[in-house]
Regions:
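A short hydrophobic beta-strand segment most commonly corresponding to one strand
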Residues: 98-100, 148-164
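A short glycine-rich, His/Asp/Glu-containing loop-to-beta-strand
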Residues: 54-86, 131
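Glycine- and acidic-residue-biased ligand/ion/polar-headgroup-sensing regions
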Residues: 95-112
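Domain-scale activation on soluble regions of proteins
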Residues: 156, 163-170, 175-177
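A short, structured loop/turn motif at beta-sheet edges
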Residues: 126, 146-149
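Short acidic-glycine-tyrosine-enriched beta hairpin
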Residues: 113-140
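N-terminal leader/capping segments at the start of a protein or of a new domain
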Residues: 1-47
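Short beta-strand His + acidic residue motifs that chelate non-heme Fe in jelly-roll/DSBH
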Residues: 89-91, 108-109, 134-135, 140-146
Length: 177
């Protein structure tokens, strides 16, 4: 995954969202409740794809593109650009996450770790304006752009990603039952 650092405090459409996220992260809730509270902030003020420039909205058929839009000690905001057919490994995350779809559809498959195998526990087709939040443990998933247009999503992670853009804690190579 290629990540660019595009942090600009004056980015139109992001300031109010950052204020709302900051308010929720300062409440001292547990990670799951923080993720759900931040998801509510996204749901109320989800920007459109025009948050990004034309250049930033371009994907790469060979790899998932990620733009770090903002980072501070309590959270970071990234935009992910998914070309048709792109998918992640089955993975979980280093911290809570809330995300919303700005363009396209992201198909998400959810899993449970049963020791020697994974069990599929759900599937969701996240459409434009759909928002979700989750926190470890229990955040094992795979995301796939099954559509024929570029998908763009905005992700808020409960970690400072300014020094490391890595959000994946673990990738799973277990059989799925």
């Amino acid at each position: 995954m290629t990540t660019t650092h595009l942090m600009t405090p004056a980015r139109p459409g992001l300031a109010d969202l950052l204020d709302g996220i900051r308010e929720q992260t300062r409440r001292g809730l547990d990670p799951r409740r923080t993720a759900l509270a931040v998801a509510d902030v996204l749901r109320a003020g989800m920007p459109g794809p025009d948050l990004l420039t034309d250049e930033e909205r371009r994907g790469d058929a060979d790899e998932l593109i990620s733009h770090l839009l903002h980072a501070e000690s309590a959270f970071s905001v990234k935009a992910l650009i998914w070309e048709p057919g792109q998918l992640t490994s089955i993975h979980d995350h280093i911290a809570w996450c809330a995300f919303g779809v700005m363009q396209g559809v992201e198909y998400e498959t959810l899993y449970r770790d049963d020791g020697d195998h994974l069990t599929e526990i759900g599937r969701v087709a996240n459409q434009v304006s759909d928002v979700s939040g989750f926190a470890p443990p229990g955040d094992i998933h795979r995301v796939h752009n099954t559509g024929d247009v570029t998908a763009i999503s905005l992700h808020v992670y409960g970690a400072d990603l300014s020094d490391s853009a890595v959000t994946i804690r673990r990738e799973y190579d277990l059989p799925v039952r």
